[in-house]
């Protein structure tokens, strides 16, 4: 009833429990005599229809018994449905040093409170809601309260000057450092990074591409790459032990090879003692404008065909990830 001529019901149930869509492959030899897997769309469609029947059958069975239904509902609510997102109230915040001609709206004050008290924060307001002022006000309050030493704002390259103007519009007496295109030319980069590291600035504003030119220390990069290799090695071993699809195993092996090559390249680099690393800047708060530019970060998962989960990785995304991990370490998840 729940199997096909190409795959039995037990295997379909196993794939379903592992959050995988069933796929049926035929194997052919290419011109070089290598065995190649080709998706059989017809058999896959039949198998996936059986998979949906199993899911629906399980769902019908779960809810058929009133006692079981009540018990499972209670367990689910106690374990997963008992957390209510915290609401933040910023009505009490004074905003010392803010331009008296400007008054933040209620949602902006609450967003600042969220940043102050809630740790890592995503500002997902609509365009025009005032996210720039929210970040600027939060940065100044963090500094005033002694909760941060120096904030770094990473914004689209063409908006650095606009950001600086809006920052000073909201806080006219703020001491900020703004990067220009010349500051990150090879001959000037070390001097500018030195200014960031030694200056007592309220905030530093740089462009996305400039941010990528400030490296993490080789030791930290190596540790993170080694951790990724370890995760991929475990994933490959698990798939082989469970007789996972050859395609999935090859995909992980390609990812492992790519990360291993990155590690080898990193180990071959000659250390440049005159390079100022990100850790040496003294930055302990990071504000990213237009953060959706940093997508396609590799994530190991058993799930397949999930929108938004990339199997390849953008260099700028992995660079930001490393820097965020470092800031979380030194701030307790508030970087």
Predicted regions and their residues:
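Charged, low-complexity intrinsically disordered regions
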Residues: 1-82, 172, 196, 200, ...
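Conserved pre-motif I regulatory segment
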Residues: 74, 79-124, 294, 303, ...
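Secondary-structure boundary/capping positions in well-ordered alpha/beta enzyme cores
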Residues: 83, 118, 122, 149, ...
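SF2 helicase/translocase NTPase motor core
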Residues: 92-103, 131-132, 143-328
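Short, hydrophobic/aromatic alpha-helical segments in well-folded domains
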Residues: 107-110, 138, 150, 323
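Walker A/P-loop
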Residues: 118-140, 149-152
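Conserved helicase ATPase motor motifs in RecA-like P-loop NTPase domains
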Residues: 127-128, 290-292, 332-335
């Amino acid at each position: 009833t729940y199997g096909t001529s190409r795959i039995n019901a037990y295997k379909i149930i196993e794939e379903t429990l592992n959050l995988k869509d069933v796929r049926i492959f035929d194997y052919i030899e290419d011109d070089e005599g290598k065995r190649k897997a080709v998706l059989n769309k017809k058999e896959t469609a039949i198998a996936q229809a059986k998979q949906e029947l199993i899911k629906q059958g399980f769902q019908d069975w779960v809810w058929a018994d009133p006692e079981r239904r009540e018990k499972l509902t209670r367990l689910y609510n106690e374990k997963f449905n008992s957390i209510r997102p915290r609401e933040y109230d910023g009505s009490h915040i004074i905003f010392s040093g803010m331009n008296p001609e400007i008054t933040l709206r209620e949602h902006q004050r609450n967003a600042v409170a969220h940043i102050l008290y809630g740790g890592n924060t995503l500002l997902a307001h609509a365009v025009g809601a005032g996210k720039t002022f929210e970040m600027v006000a939060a940065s100044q309050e963090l500094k005033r309260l002694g909760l941060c030493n120096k904030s770094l704002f990473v914004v689209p390259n063409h908006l650095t000057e606009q950001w600086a103007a809006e920052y000073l519009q909201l806080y006219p007496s703020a001491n900020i450092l703004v990067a220009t295109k010349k500051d990150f030319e090879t001959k000037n980069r070390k001097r500018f990074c030195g200014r960031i590291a030694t200056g007592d600035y309220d905030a530093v504003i740089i462009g996305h591409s400039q941010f990528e030119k400030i490296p993490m220390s080789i030791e930290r990069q190596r540790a993170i790459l080694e951790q990724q290799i370890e995760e991929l090695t475990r994933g490959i071993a698990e798939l082989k032990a469970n007789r996972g699809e050859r395609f999935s195993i090859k995909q992980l092996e390609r990812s492992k090879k790519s990360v291993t090559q990155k590690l080898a390249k990193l180990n071959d680099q000659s250390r440049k003692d005159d390079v100022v690393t990100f850790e040496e800047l003294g930055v302990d708060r990071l504000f990213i404008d237009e953060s959706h530019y940093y997508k396609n970060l590799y994530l190991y998962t058993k799930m397949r065909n999930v929108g938004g989960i990339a199997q390849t990785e953008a260099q700028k995304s992995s660079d930001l990830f490393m820097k965020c991990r470092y800031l979380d370490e030194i701030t307790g998840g508030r970087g």
